[in-house]
């Protein structure tokens, strides 16, 4: 926005935030903000107001803004006198001058370490509610020339992004890694595939301070032809990428030997010649290959099994001694309903079968503003508005799987009516868990038998909905959530249509 000031007058702009939802003002709750400015003006006034500007809830003023040649970050604080979930932020220039403003932020004052790191505290709580044990920061945002580590430290500005022409460096790799470290969760992040080596080395050195597993992905969906920067699915592109990987990994590993590295060539079975050349180019440098899989409902685990089998076959043919393994950094489904929850549960069943050969599986996307999507990926695990955050069905499926995790895979056989099943147990052999997906539109009666005796049902938890397209709206955020059905299942061991069931058994 540009603000022009006739002599002695005031002019300004007002904004109600994303989708004009409003800024959630709470009486007495201090809010911290900033805006980037360029130009000169006698003063800037910041105010929280009613949506129409007729009532003012809080004001603050910064005198003498003098930034004629470069953008300057101006910080301010506001303490509203009333509660209003639909307030607006006004920025006015006072006196004489001319000033440009951009990239404004206003958030509640932090109450814990996550807030101090620049995170919305309720969003982090939503991550924790899922029981996440791995985080990944990446996507096509890295496939632009200005997505570079050198711009992610110190004073930040903005850049021309993949999804939005004006994109912010405000929350990037440093903030993400600090958040993961505070959560005590291993994490992966993508860097530009053609990051300058000297900057990559600085990043590797900075990462030495963190005592958690860190995985550096070189690029994202490379050699896929999705945009000009990521390269085409041809041999010149894959060799150019391989050369950059070897250069970056060699330098970063020398600086920080603890780092693990991930190949980002897009796995497309129709381009096996490209995949094989990509393997030759990066084998011995990358520890993992990132696999992106589609998930469209129950049965999606088949996609994982097929891709893992193809990768294993390629490795056996080209270098049986290779230590490269797989990681699923994106489960993509373009929907966030009950169907997506069944897809994730199905994929996790297939992932357990792979053991240590598969590092993790991350359902995309972690976050999505309610009723707002810029890039077509309508698949948020956690939805949010300015004043709340809540889990969609897939995130609840993740929470169920995490809460019932056991380390040891147990052989399982399904007879009769088709359901998807995986069985696990603890190291002591006293607790066993069955993960069961029923993708059929009919209920299924289950008869569970163990190879050894003494097992009794300890708990049954079920996730189901009235329809595969059901999701959780903001006015009913727990419409679809796990329900304890232990007593019901003991009496009638039946599984609802199109549902995910976790059965926990115990023995002395």
Which residues does each predicted region cover?
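Extracellular and organelle-lumenal recognition/adhesion modules and their flexible linkers in secreted
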Residues: 1-171, 186, 201, 228, ...
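Short strand-edge motifs at loop-to-beta-strand transitions and within beta-strands
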Residues: 72-76, 491, 501
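Noncatalytic carbohydrate-binding groove/subsite architecture in carbohydrate-active enzymes
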Residues: 87-98, 235-348, 354-357, 417-418, ...
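An active-site-proximal structural segment forming one wall of the substrate-binding cleft
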Residues: 88, 111, 115-132, 176-183, ...
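The substrate-binding groove and active-site-proximal loops of carbohydrate-active enzymes
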Residues: 107-117, 156-169, 186-195, 221-242, ...
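Aromatic/acidic polysaccharide-binding cleft in carbohydrate-active enzymes
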Residues: 327-430
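Carbohydrate-binding surface patches
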Residues: 418-454, 460-465, 498-504
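Acidic, Ser/Thr/Pro-rich beta/coil linker or hinge segments at domain junctions
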Residues: 454-495
């Amino acid at each position: 926005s540009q603000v022009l000031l006739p002599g002695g007058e005031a002019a300004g702009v007002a904004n109600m935030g994303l989708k004009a939802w409003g800024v959630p003002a709470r009486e007495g709750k201090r809010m911290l903000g900033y805006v980037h400015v360029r130009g000169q003006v006698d003063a800037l006034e910041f105010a929280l107001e009613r949506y129409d500007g007729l009532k003012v809830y809080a004001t603050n003023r910064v005198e003498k803004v003098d930034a004629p040649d470069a953008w300057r970050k101006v910080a301010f604080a506001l303490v509203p006198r009333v509660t209003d979930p639909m307030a607006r932020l006004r920025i006015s220039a006072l006196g004489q001058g001319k000033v440009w403003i951009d990239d404004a932020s206003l958030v509640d004052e932090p109450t814990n370490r996550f807030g101090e790191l620049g995170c919305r505290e309720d969003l982090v709580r939503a991550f924790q509610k899922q029981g996440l044990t791995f985080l990944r920061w990446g996507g096509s945002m890295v496939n632009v020339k200005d997505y570079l580590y050198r711009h992610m430290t110190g004073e930040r500005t903005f850049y021309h992004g993949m999804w939005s022409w004006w994109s912010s460096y405000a929350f990037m790799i440093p903030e993400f890694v600090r958040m993961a470290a505070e959560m005590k969760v291993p994490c992966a992040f993508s860097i530009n595939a053609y990051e300058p080596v000297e900057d990559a080395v600085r990043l590797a050195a900075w990462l030495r301070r963190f005592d958690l597993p860190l995985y550096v992905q070189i690029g994202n969906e490379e050699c896929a032809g999705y945009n000009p920067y990521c390269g085409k699915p041809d041999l010149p592109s894959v060799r150019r990428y391989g050369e950059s990987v070897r250069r970056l990994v060699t330098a970063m590993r020398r600086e920080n030997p603890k780092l693990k590295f991930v190949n980002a060539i897009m796995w497309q079975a129709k381009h096996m010649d490209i995949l094989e050349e990509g393997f030759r180019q990066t084998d011995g440098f990358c520890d993992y290959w990132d696999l992106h899989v589609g998930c469209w409902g129950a049965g999606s685990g088949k996609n994982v099994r097929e891709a893992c089998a193809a990768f294993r076959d390629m490795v056996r043919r080209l270098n049986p001694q290779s230590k490269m393994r797989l990681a699923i950094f994106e489960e993509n489904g373009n929907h966030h309903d009950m169907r997506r929850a069944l897809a994730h549960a199905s994929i996790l069943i297939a992932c357990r079968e792979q053991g240590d050969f598969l590092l993790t599986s991350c359902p995309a996307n972690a976050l999505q503003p309610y009723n707002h999507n810029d890039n077509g990926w309508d698949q948020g695990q956690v939805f949010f508005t300015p004043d709340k955050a809540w889990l969609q069905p897939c995130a609840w499926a993740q929470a169920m799987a995490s809460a019932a995790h056991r380390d040891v895979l147990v052989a399982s056989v399904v007879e009769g009516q088709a359901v998807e099943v995986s069985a696990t147990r603890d190291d002591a052999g006293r607790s066993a868990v069955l993960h069961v997906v029923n993708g059929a539109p009919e209920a299924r009666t289950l008869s569970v038998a163990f190879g050894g005796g003494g097992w009794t049902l300890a708990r049954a938890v079920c996730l189901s909905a009235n329809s595969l397209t059901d999701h959780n709206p903001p006015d009913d955020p727990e419409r679809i959530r796990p329900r304890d059905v232990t007593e019901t299942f003991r009496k009638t061991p039946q599984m609802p249509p199109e549902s995910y069931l976790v059965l926990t058994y115990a023995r002395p």
